[in-house]
């Protein structure tokens, strides 16, 4: 009776991780986080004006998402801070390769 290696499930795990990641990205990018204005028949999420005989709605576009974003300048956006912090962490982790036994850098 020959010995056989166990089945390799890495392809399955990679496909499952990609599927879950794709579903999460699609769900996050397709949901609306804008404030809902109007009633069940008249929805004005991007601003606008609606008038009929008994009611009038004037709603202007949302200006900013939160108090973290002070303006429309690129250097005041929170995503820039995230990118800079990730780059700083990645660059600070690049140090000389140390020998795991003696904890010194050897020349090649």
Swiss-Prot record:
Chief location of this protein within or outside the cell: host cell
Cytoplasmic face of the membrane: 1-8, 94-108
GO cellular component: host cell endoplasmic reticulum membrane; membrane
TM helices/strands, residue ranges: 9-29, 73-93
Role summary: Plays a role in viral cell-to-cell propagation, by facilitating genome transport to neighboring plant cells through plasmosdesmata,.
Keyword Transport: yes
Lineage: superkingdom: Viruses
Entry protein name: Movement protein TGB2
Location in or out of the cell: Host endoplasmic reticulum membrane
Matching InterPro entries: Plant_vir_prot (IPR001896)
GO biological process entries: transport of virus in host, cell to cell
Record has Disulfide bond as a keyword: no
Pfam families per the UniProt record, alphabetical: Plant_vir_prot (PF01307)
Positions in the Lumenal compartment: 30-72
Keywords, ordered alphabetically: Host endoplasmic reticulum, Host membrane, Membrane, Transmembrane, Transmembrane helix, Transport, Viral movement protein
General remark: TGBp1, TGBp2 and TGBp3 seem to act together for cell-to-cell propagation. TGBp1 is the main movement protein that physically cross the plasmodesma with the viral genome. TGBp2 and TGBp3 would facilitate TGBp1 function.
Family of this protein: Belongs to the Tymovirales TGBp2 protein family.
């Amino acid at each position: 009776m020959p010995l056989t290696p166990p089945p390799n499930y890495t392809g399955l795990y990679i496909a499952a991780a990609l599927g879950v990641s794709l579903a999460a990205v699609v769900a996050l990018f397709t949901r609306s986080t804008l404030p809902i204005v109007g009633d069940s028949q008249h929805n004005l999420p991007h601003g606008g004006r609606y008038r009929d005989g008994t009611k009038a709605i004037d709603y202007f576009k949302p200006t900013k998402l939160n108090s973290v974003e002070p303006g429309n300048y690129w250097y005041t956006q929170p995503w820039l801070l995230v990118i800079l912090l990730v780059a700083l962490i990645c660059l600070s982790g690049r140090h000389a390769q140390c020998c795991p036994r003696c904890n010194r850098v050897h020349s090649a």
